[in-house]
Curated annotation (Swiss-Prot):
Site label Cleavage, positions: R344, G345
Described function: Binds to sialic acid-containing receptors on the cell surface, bringing about the attachment of the virus particle to the cell. This attachment induces virion internalization of about two third of the virus particles through clathrin-dependent endocytosis and about one third through a clathrin- and caveolin-independent pathway. Plays a major role in the determination of host range restriction and virulence. Class I viral fusion protein. Binds to sialic acid-containing receptors on the cell surface, bringing about the attachment of the virus particle to the cell. This attachment induces virion internalization either through clathrin-dependent endocytosis or through clathrin- and caveolin-independent pathway. Plays a major role in the determination of host range restriction and virulence. Class I viral fusion protein. Responsible for penetration of the virus into the cell cytoplasm by mediating the fusion of the membrane of the endocytosed virus particle with the endosomal membrane.
Record-given protein name: Hemagglutinin
Entry similarity comment: Belongs to the influenza viruses hemagglutinin family.
Extra facts: Major glycoprotein, comprises over 80% of the envelope proteins present in virus particle. The extent of infection into host organism is determined by HA. Influenza viruses bud from the apical surface of polarized epithelial cells (e.g. bronchial epithelial cells) into lumen of lungs and are therefore usually pneumotropic. The reason is that HA is cleaved by tryptase clara which is restricted to lungs. However, HAs of H5 and H7 pantropic avian viruses subtypes can be cleaved by furin and subtilisin-type enzymes, allowing the virus to grow in other organs than lungs.
SUPFAM superfamilies, alphabetized: Influenza hemagglutinin (stalk), Viral protein domain
Side Cytoplasmic, residues: 551-565
Keyword line: Clathrin- and caveolin-independent endocytosis of virus by host, Clathrin-mediated endocytosis of virus by host, Disulfide bond, Fusion of virus membrane with host endosomal membrane, Fusion of virus membrane with host membrane, Glycoprotein, Hemagglutinin, Host cell membrane, Host membrane, Host-virus interaction, Lipoprotein, Membrane, Palmitate, Signal, Transmembrane, Transmembrane helix, Viral attachment to host cell, Viral envelope protein, Viral penetration into host cytoplasm, Virion, Virus endocytosis by host, Virus entry into host cell
GO biological process terms, semicolon-separated: clathrin-dependent endocytosis of virus by host cell; fusion of virus membrane with host endosome membrane; fusion of virus membrane with host plasma membrane; viral budding from plasma membrane; virion attachment to host cell
Gene Ontology molecular functions: host cell surface receptor binding
Species name: Influenza A virus (strain A/Equine/Miami/1/1963 H3N8)
Extracellular-side positions: 17-529
Major localization class: virion
Subcellular location: Virion membrane; Host apical cell membrane
Length: 565
């Protein structure tokens, strides 16, 4: 009976001292927004830290189609750019086209006399960057030879033909005199001349076409000279031909002179291509071209450029995000997330930001919860919320500005003899990608660290601002809450929120209540301890009473206890 009485008294005492139960005190807690399921991001100090909100920075998918706006995209269909430039009869439609981006398809093929270009990648890139196949014919004089040679491998309609931008010269009346032709550049722009040399498949074909047993072609300017001798010999048959043509090119600067000297095997130019400098380029892709708008194009299709990074493709054209290896990089756009605890002690008291965040806040990132004689309420603090949002807004734009540039990363090709150069180029490109990937991860981690630090700082600023207002009228409870030692209704709480609280008005009441409560007050952290202590004492007393009863019964003979050894 005594035990039960002690337990009841202790429990009643603890409940009677519950700080939230009186009308002369109030509890004010400061807290921040939280969500049930946050997003994990990386910072400088943590690989994984949960925040309330984050934005993905890596574009990892494409639209699957190439947009034809705002760039002029030219679909090469079955034609390669070099075939269009040379004037393959099957692709005459491309001869006066302009483009920002020329799309070469994997199905493209040559359909004229078989040829090779020793410096194919450079010529392809040069013509692609010009953005046009604008061609100007010139009056070259070729005396003593037959012009306009053709082949059954290159038909225009039903007749044998040849590349329209080249002139195949052969013997005339069993004679092929030495040719010496000059062509000055009197204009104020660079001129691109395309020429070539024919490699017959047999010696008999050589003498039949050019009389001499071996020809020679020399093309010179003031800055350069190329001398090419044909390689006579049989090669694999292509479109009924075992001979080949090698295509070369020469750029003639303003004021310079083009000189051509040959005694056989010359594939002569018919004029020049006007060179232009620009941002035009070429790309291999099988993605369909559609009517849409996108400033970034990859071989996989167009992609949005509203993110600073992408890992869709290394090859891009336009205003594109930087390519990185990571498939995801998340930028924190919210604060540190600490999900709200569903149960906070046996009395269900409200808790501040030091314990956890608050879910369900709709009127701000930071706010107040309070318990007073009018109940338990919550309100947001717009000023501190706006201060944090203002600093976070623009982070994404700043990251994009640091990374997005108007540039195009073209694909690179090398012939087999340039294998070591290709390996070196690949190593350089891979190193650049590794560096950018590392820089991207570091940049995002730094920004995330800054975001979390500044949101924590705004919370601390609000807490210190409240502490300075309350002064000795309240006590810091250590969990982000204040115990206010005077009656504080909703109007009083509102004055604390908006910064108009006058602590002098409540000072006397607070001091009086503080002294009265101090004598009997138990902090909420000790209530559970007292309950456990009272429970333990009760159990101990019950055990003592039970043991005493057993000993008394044994003494009276009502209970016998035999001990056998």
């Amino acid at each position: 009976m005594k035990t039960t009485t002690i337990l009841i008294l202790l429990t009643h005492w603890v409940h009677s001292q519950n700080p939230t139960g009186g009308n002369n005190t109030a509890t004010l807690c400061l807290g921040h927004h939280a969500v049930a399921n946050g997003t994990l991001v990386k910072t400088i100090t943590d690989d994984q830290i949960e925040v309330t909100n984050a934005t993905e920075l890596v574009q990892s998918t494409s639209t699957g189609k190439i947009c034809n706006n705002p760039y002029r995209v030219l679909d090469g269909r079955n034609c390669t750019l070099i075939d269009a430039m040379l004037g393959d009869p099957h692709y005459d439609v491309f001869q006066y086209e302009n483009w920002d981006l020329f799309i070469e398809r994997s199905s493209a093929f040559s359909n004229c006399y078989p040829y090779d270009v020793p410096d194919y990648a450079s010529l392809r890139s040069l013509v692609a960057s010009s953005g046009t196949l604008e061609f100007m014919a010139e009056g070259f004089t070729w005396t003593g030879v037959t012009q306009n040679g053709g082949s059954s491998a290159c038909r225009r309609g039903s007749a044998d033909s040849f590349f329209s931008r080249l002139n195949w010269l052969t013997q005339s009346e069993s004679s092929y005199p030495t040719l010496n032709v000059t062509m000055p550049n009197n204009d104020n722009f660079d001129k691109l001349y395309i020429w070539g040399i024919h490699h017959p498949s047999t010696n008999n074909e050589q003498t039949k076409l050019y009389v001499q047993a071996s020809g020679r072609v020399t093309v010179s300017t003031k800055r350069s000279q190329q001398t090419i001798i044909p390689n006579i010999g049989s090669r694999p048959w292509v479109r009924g031909q075992s001979g080949r043509i090698s295509i070369y090119w020469t750029i003639v600067k303003p004021g310079d002179v083009l000189m051509i000297n040959s005694n056989g095997n010359l594939i002569a130019p018919r004029g020049y291509f006007k060179m232009r400098t620009g941002k035009s380029s070429i790309m291999r892709s099988d993605a369909p071209i559609d009517t849409c708008v996108s400033e970034c194009i990859t071989p996989n299709g167009s992609i949005p450029n509203d993110k600073p990074f992408q890992n869709v493709n290394k090859v891009t054209y336009g205003k594109c995000p930087k390519y990185v290896k990571q498939s995801t990089l998340k930028l924190a756009t919210g604060m540190r997330n600490v999900p709200e605890k569903q149960i906070r002690g046996i009395f269900g008291a409200i808790a501040g930001f030091i314990e956890n965040g608050w879910e369900g806040m709709v009127d701000g990132w930071y706010g107040f919860r309070y318990q007073n004689s009018e109940g338990t309420l919550q309100a947001g603090d717009l000023k501190s919320t706006q201060a944090a949002i203002d600093q976070i807004n623009g982070k994404l734009n700043r990251v994009i500005e640091k990374t997005n540039e108007k540039f195009h990363q073209i694909e690179k090709e090398f012939s087999e003899v340039e294998g070591r150069i290709q390996d070196l180029e690949k190593y350089v490109e891979d190193t650049k990608i590794d560096l950018w990937s590392y820089n991207a991860e570091l940049l995002v981690a730094l920004e995330n660290q800054h975001t979390i630090d500044l949101t924590d700082a705004e919370m601390n600023k609000l807490f210190e601002k409240t502490r300075r207002q309350l002064r000795e009228n309240a006590e810091d409870m250590g969990n982000g809450c204040f115990k206010i030692y005077h009656k504080c209704d909703n109007a009083c709480i509102e004055s604390i929120r908006n910064g108009t609280y006058d602590h002098d008005i409540y000072r006397d009441e607070a001091l009086n209540n503080r002294f009265q409560i101090r004598g009997v007050e138990l902090k909420s952290g000790y209530k559970d301890w007292i309950l456990w202590i009272s429970f333990a004492i009760s159990c101990f007393l019950i055990c003592v009473v039970l043991l005493g009863f057993i000993m008394w019964a044994c003494q009276k003979g009502n209970i016998r206890c035999n001990i056998c050894i």
